[in-house]
A protein has these predicted regions:
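Charged, surface-exposed helical/loop "interaction arms" that form contiguous linear patches used
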Residues: 369, 373, 383-386, 405, ...
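Short secondary-structure subsegments characteristic of cysteine-rich extracellular domains
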Residues: 369-393, 503-511, 581-583, 589, ...
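Conserved phosphate-binding elements of NTP-dependent enzyme cores
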Residues: 5, 13-17, 24, 545, ...
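Extended, charged coiled-coil "arm/hinge" scaffolds of SMC/Rad50-like chromosome-maintenance ATPases
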Residues: 508, 512-546
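Charged catalytic and DNA/RNA-contacting regions of genome-maintenance
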Residues: 1-339, 348, 352-355, 359-368, ...
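ATPase nucleotide-binding head domains, primarily ABC-like/P-loop NTPase cores
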Residues: 39-40, 238, 308-309, 316-319, ...
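Active-site phosphate-binding and catalytic loops of NTP-dependent enzymes
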Residues: 91, 114-123, 259, 395-402, ...
Length: 872
C-alpha cells in the first residue's frame, strides 16, 4: 500500500516511524485501552484473528484500515499469533495522556517471538521454550546456543566435527527450539535445513554476521555474566560456540530492550556426556509423545511424570531427552532414588511439601522483567515458607551424596518470605494499580494518606450536617460525580435559602447543584490523598519487587536443586507404584534383563497381564538377537522394551524388570515401523534406507541398535539381500559389532546364526490349534520359518472366502516351488511357477519393443520394468 507519509496526521507519522524500525513485526500500537493495528498489519491480522476491520482518520483522503484488541486481553491474541509464526512489536504509551500536552510519547518496549515468550499462560507448564542460535562457517565448526527466557537456562555446545550435520540434528532434536537464529553460511548445512523445515517446523530468523561478532558483543556478554573474560565461562575467545552465544545475547538484547538480567550463568555442555539419540530414536521410542497421535498420553514422559512442581516437570523432560553416559553420575541418581524407595515415609512427606511449591524459575523471570503481580510475590513467599520443612526431610536421606549436595544448594530464602509477608496483604488484588496491595503498618506515609481516604466519608457527612444547620436547608445533600467532583444539591423548594457564597454548577429539573470554596478544598484533600496513596503504593511495590530481584542467584540455585529433588522423588514414586527394580550399572558390555516389561504398554493394559521377557546381549557371542515371528506377535514391543529399559537406567530411574544389569551404551538407534514421509517426497522404502544408512554411518561398538523388518518396502529378493547385508555389516566386529535386536520376517536369515559369530536366533512363541493361532508374547531361543501370514489376516478380520482362497493359492505356490527344486532339469516350457512366467513376460516385452524409436528416458523405463520382472 503506497502512502504519502508527509500528509499523515502526527500520530500516524509516529506510527510509521516505529513501523519502519520493525518491518518484519506486527506493530501493536497502544491507544488508550487498546492495541491498534493499521494499514497492512490491520488487514492481515484482522483475517488471522477474525477481528472487525474498521477505519480511522489519518490525514489522507481515505481512512486508514484499523483493527484492535483490548490491552487486558493481549495474551490470548499473542498466543494465537505466535503459534502461527508471527513476531509482534509491543508499543506502549510512555507518558500519561491525561497530563501530556500534544502527542503522547510512545516506543516499542519488547518484541515477542516464538522463542522469546516469558508469559506462563502462553507456555507449556512442563516444557522449556528454547530459542536457538546456530552459527556456522563454511568448512569450519558449527556452534549452538540454546536459551529459555522464561527460566534463565542458557546452554552452549560445539557438536563434534565428525558427522557434523548428524550431531547438529541430534542437538536440535534434544532441545526442539521454538525459534532458530542463524547466519547465512548455516544455509549450507543442507541436511540440517531439511530437518528444520520438515521435522521441527519452527520459525527461522536470519541474522547478519555482525550479530555474531565479538566486536559487537564481547564486552556486553562479559558484563552480563559478570566475568572479566570468556574463559571464566569455559568459552574460547574465538570459536563457533562463542559466536552462537554472541548471536543469542544480541537477539535477546534487541527483543527485550536490554531487559536481560535474567541470565546470570551459562552452561557449556559436552555432547559426550549424554546418550546419543537421533530424531528417529526419540520418535520411535515415543519418549515425549506418541508416534501416531502426537499425544502426551502413551509416551514415556506421560508414564514417568509424577513430579509435583512445574520446575520438576521440565527437569524430568530434560533428563528423559538427555540420558547420562557417565556411570558415576547414573549411580548417584539411582542411589538417591533407592533411599527414597526405602524411606517411603520421607518420600511421602517430601512430595507433600513439593505440592505447595510454585514455579520459582518463571516467577523470578516475571520479577526480573517487572511484570510480576502482587499474587506472584505471594507465591514466592509461599514457596519460601516451605523450604525449612523440605530441608528437614532431606536431612533424613542426606547420607546419599547427590541428595546431600542438593540439600546444600537449597537456600532458606527467609528474606523473601519475610519481606513479602511484611509488605503485601494476605489476598492481594491482581494489579497494584487497583490499590490495597501494601499491608497496613509497612509504611507510615501510606498509612496517613489512607487515613484521610478512609475518613473522607466522615468529613463529607460532617460538612453536610454543618451546612444544613448554617443554611436551614433540611434537604441539603452533598454528592459526587466524576465530572464535577463533590457538589451541594438543593431542591427547588429551598432556593430562597441558598447563601451568597454558593456557586451554581448545574441546573437539573427539580434541583440545583452548587459548590463552595470550603467544599472544593475538602475535595482536593480527599482526592489528592487517594492519588498520592496509589502513587506511593506503586512506588513501594516496585521497591519490594526490586529487592526480590536482587535475590536471583539464590533463588535460581534453589529452584534447580528443588527440581532435581522433585524428579528423583517422582522416579521413586513410579518405581513403588509399578514394582520397578534398581538396575545394576556395568561397563563389561553386558545387557541382561530378567522379567523385563515395556513400561508404557504395561500401564496401558487395563485387564490383560503383560508377559515379561528375558534378554541377554553382550559384545561377543550375543551381539545380535535375530528375532523371527509373525506380525502382531510382539516383536516390536519387545525390542522397544529393551531400549526403554536401557534408557531408563541411564536417566537414573528404576526399571520394569525383576533384575537388570545394564552396561552403559553411548547411542541408541531405531529403525522401527514404516510411514511414508510424504512431506519430504520420499517413499517408505527410501525413508527406511535413509534411517538404516544413518545407523551404519554413526553407530559405534558401544551402541544399541533396534532394527525392525529391514527391507520390507521393496521386492522380496532385494529385501532379503539388503536385510542380510545390513545384519552382516552391523554384527561384524571389524565394522561395528554393537549390540543389536534385529526383527525380521525373512526366514532366510535364520542361517546367519551358523555363519556369523555373535548372531543368536530367537522367536516369538506361537500356539497353533488347527487353522488358528494364539500369540504367547514370549521370546524363546531358536528361529521359525513360518510367518503365519494367513492366520494373522484371519485375526485381522478378512472375510472367510478370502482366507480360504489364500490358503489354496499358498499350497499351489508351495507345490510349484517344491516341484521346481526337485526337477531342475525340467524344460522351461513345463514350468508354470511365477518366476518362469515373469521371465517370459520380460522376453515378450523386449520382443515387442523397438529401442530405436524410444528416447533415452523411455529406454531406461523399459529396462527398469524388465529388471523388476526378472527380480521377482
Amino acid at each position: 500500500m503506497e502512502i504519502q507519509k508527509e500528509k499523515l496526521s502526527p500520530m500516524m507519522q509516529q506510527y510509521f516511524a516505529l513501523k519502519e524500525k520493525y518491518p518484519d513485526c506486527v506493530l501493536f500500537f497502544r491507544l488508550g485501552d487498546f492495541y491498534e493495528m493499521f494499514f497492512d498489519d490491520a488487514i492481515r491480522i484482522s483475517r488471522e484473528l477474525e477481528l472487525t476491520l474498521t477505519g480511522r482518520d489519518c490525514g489522507l483522503k481515505e481512512r486508514a484500515p484499523m483493527c484492535g484488541i483490548p490491552y487486558h486481553s493481549v495474551d490470548m491474541y499473542l498466543k494465537r499469533l505466535v503459534e502461527r509464526g508471527y513476531k509482534i512489536a509491543i508499543c506502549e504509551q510512555l507518558t500519561d495522556p491525561a497530563t501530556t500536552k500534544g502527542l503522547v510519547e510512545r516506543d516499542v518496549i519488547r518484541i515477542v517471538t516464538p522463542g522469546t515468550l516469558i508469559e506462563s499462560n502462553l507456555l507449556e507448564e512442563g516444557a522449556n521454550n528454547y530459542l536457538c542460535s546456530l552459527y556456522f562457517e563454511e568448512g569450519g565448526d558449527c556452534g549452538l546456543c540454546f536459551a529459555d527466557l522464561s527460566t534463565g537456562d542458557i546452554i552452549a555446545l560445539l557438536p563434534e566435527q565428525k558427522n557434523l550435520e548428524a550431531n547438529v540434528i541430534d542437538a536440535l532434536s534434544r532441545y526442539t527450539p521454538a525459534e532458530i537464529l542463524m547466519n547465512e553460511d548455516a544455509l549450507l548445512l543442507k541436511n540440517v535445513m531439511e530437518f528444520i523445515k520438515i521435522r521441527l517446523q519452527c520459525v527461522v530468523t536470519m541474522r547478519d554476521a555482525e550479530c555474531f561478532s565479538a566486536e559487537r558483543n564481547h564486552d556486553f556478554v562479559c558484563h552480563q555474566f559478570q566475568v572479566p573474560e570468556l574463559s571464566y565461562l569455559q568459552l574460547p575467545e574465538t570459536g563457533s560456540e562463542t559466536a552462537a552465544v554472541y548471536g543469542m545475547m544480541d537477539y535477546i538484547k534487541e527483543t527485550q530492550k536490554n531487559q536481560i538480567a535474567r541470565f546470570i550463568s551459562l552452561t557449556v555442555n559436552d555432547d559426550d556426556a549424554y546418550l546419543g539419540l537421533d530424531f528417529n530414536a526419540r520418535r520411535n521410542l515415543e519418549l515425549t509423545e506418541t508416534l501416531r497421535g502426537k499425544e502426551r498420553k502413551g509416551s514415556l514422559l506421560w508414564l514417568m511424570n509424577t513430579a509435583k512442581t512445574s520446575m520438576g516437570k521440565r527437569m524430568l523432560k530434560t533428563w528423559i531427552e538427555q540420558p547420562l553416559v557417565q556411570p558415576a553420575k547414573i549411580m548417584a541418581r539411582l542411589d538417591a532414588v533407592e533411599i527414597f524407595v526405602k524411606k517411603s515415609v520421607v518420600l511421602m512427606e517430601v512430595r507433600s511439601i513439593l505440592d505447595s511449591v510454585y514455579d520459582l524459575e518463571r516467577l523470578m523471570t516475571r520479577v526480573l522483567y517487572k511484570t510480576a503481580t502482587p499474587r506472584d510475590l505471594k507465591a514466592l513467599a509461599t514457596t519460601a515458607r516451605q523450604i525449612p520443612a523440605l530441608k528437614a526431610e532431606l536431612e533424613k536421606v542426606a547420607d546419599r551424596k547427590l541428595l546431600a549436595r542438593l540439600l546444600s544448594q537449597i537456600s532458606n530464602l527467609d528474606m523473601v518470605a519475610d519481606l513479602v509477608d511484611r509488605a503485601i496483604v494476605e489476598n492481594p488484588p491482581v494489579s497494584v494499580k487497583d490499590g490495597g496491595v501494601i499491608r497496613e503498618g509497612f509504611h507510615q506515609d501510606l498509612d496517613y494518606l489512607r487515613g484521610i481516604m478512609n475518613g473522607g466519608n466522615q468529613i463529607i457527612e460532617k460538612m453536610e450536617q454543618s451546612e444544613r444547620e448554617r443554611t436551614g436547608i433540611k434537604g441539603l445533600k452533598i454528592g459526587f460525580n466524576r465530572v464535577f467532583g463533590y457538589y451541594i444539591e438543593v431542591t427547588r423548594s429551598y432556593y430562597d435559602l441558598v447563601p451568597d457564597d454558593y456557586v451554581r454548577k448545574q441546573t437539573l429539573t427539580n434541583c440545583e447543584r452548587f459548590i463552595t470554596p470550603d467544599l472544593k478544598k475538602t475535595e482536593n484533600d480527599i482526592l489528592s490523598a487517594k492519588e498520592k496513596a496509589l502513587r506511593l503504593e506503586e512506588s513501594l511495590y516496585v521497591e519490594v519487587r526490586d529487592c526480590l530481584a536482587a535475590q536471583l542467584k539464590q533463588v535460581q540455585e534453589t529452584a534447580s536443586a528443588i527440581a532435581q529433588v522433585d524428579v528423583l522423588a517422582a522416579f521413586a514414586n513410579v518405581a513403588i507404584e509399578n514394582q520397578y527394580t534398581k538396575p545394576e550399572i556395568a561397563m563389561d558390555g553386558v545387557i541382561q534383563i530378567r522379567g523385563g516389561r515395556h513400561p508404557v504398554v504395561e500401564r496401558m493394559l487395563s485387564d490383560d497381564i503383560f508377559v515379561p521377557n528375558d534378554t541377554y546381549l553382550d559384545n561377543k557371542a550375543n551381539r545380535m538377537l535375530l528375532i523371527t515371528g509373525p506380525n502382531m506377535a510382539g516383536k516390536s514391543t519387545y525390542m522397544r522394551q529393551v531400549a526403554l529399559i536401557t534408557l531408563m537406567a541411564q536417566i537414573g530411574s528404576f526399571v520394569p524388570a525383576d533384575y537388570a544389569k545394564i552396561s552403559v551404551v553411548d547411542k541408541i538407534f531405531t529403525r522401527v515401523g514404516a510411514s511414508d514421509d510424504l512431506t519430504a517426497g520420499q517413499s517408505t522404502f527410501m525413508v527406511e534406507m535413509h534411517e538404516v544408512s544413518d545407523i551404519l554411518k554413526y553407530a559405534t561398538p558401544n551402541s544399541l541398535v533396534i532394527l525392525d523388518e529391514v527391507g520390507r518396502g521393496t521386492s522380496t529378493f532385494d529385501g532379503v539381500s539388503i536385510a542380510r547385508a545390513v545384519a552382516e555389516y552391523i554384527c561384524n566386529s571389524r565394522q561395528i559389532g554393537c549390540k543389536t535386536l534385529f526383527a525380521t520376517h525373512y526366514h532366510e536369515l535364520i542361517d546367519l546364526e551358523h555363519t556369523i559369530e555373535g548372531v543368536k536366533n530367537y522367536s516369538i512363541a506361537v500356539k497353533k490349534h488347527g487353522d488358528t493361532i494364539r500369540f504367547l508374547r514370549k521370546i524363546v531361543p531358536g528361529g521359525i520359518d513360518d510367518s503365519y501370514g494367513i492366520e494373522v489376516a484371519k485375526l485381522a478380520g478378512l472375510p472367510e472366502k478370502v482366507v480360504k482362497r489364500a490358503r489354496v493359492l499358498l499350497r499351489q505356490m508351495e507345490q510349484q516351488i517344491a516341484a521346481q527344486n526337485q526337477k531342475p532339469e525340467q524344460s522351461d516350457d513345463m514350468q508354470y511357477n511365477f518366476a518362469a512366467m515373469q521371465q517370459e513376460q520380460a522376453v515378450q516385452m523386449l520382443k515387442k519393443t523397438n529401442l530405436q524409436e524410444l528416447s533415452d528416458a523411455e529406454c531406461r523405463q523399459v529396462l527398469e520394468e524388465v529388471t523388476n520382472l526378472l527380480r521377482g
